[in-house]
Amino acid sequence: MLFRSKLTASLGWAPDRLPIQEQATIVVGNALRLEWASICPPTEDTIVAGNPPFLGPHSRSKEQLQDLQLVWGTKDLGRLDYVTAWHRKSEQYFESTKRGRFALVSTNSVSQGDQVARLFPSLFAAGWRLRFAHQTFAWTSEAVGAAAVHCVITGFDKAEPTPPLLYAYTQVRGEPI
């Protein structure tokens, strides 16, 4: 019961059934071309979390451009980063539910300039609200060839309104305060 209380305090919600039962399903494919609901039907308790690829308009392949066009339903993408396709896919995935949650690591470019005007209005119009956000921070990894980018993390939900949380950083390479 204590664990459930801590989960509720930190996330604002805890699943009814703890411990969580393992159900491994591995699907190999292009996440932007797969129908997510056919793999895992959305429920009001489903959470989508991810760290999709960061690819700006000058660094994606023709296939990735086609993925982005398919998900957004337009060839007029402006400067939308490839990662925005996962925001749109998450929005589409939860269309049949009244609730849902998703959080994604993205390049900080999605929170500035013309990408803001293209990405966020459709989310807000569909009833999504910003639940939490991490301000820009430097991506760190011990992996060989790790991305050298500045990131944000944004979390969205359709739940009852509560004040959104902002995780601020005094330095991009620091810890949130």
Indicate residue ranges for each PLM-predicted region.
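Signature of N6-adenine DNA methyltransferases within the class I
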Residues: M1-I177
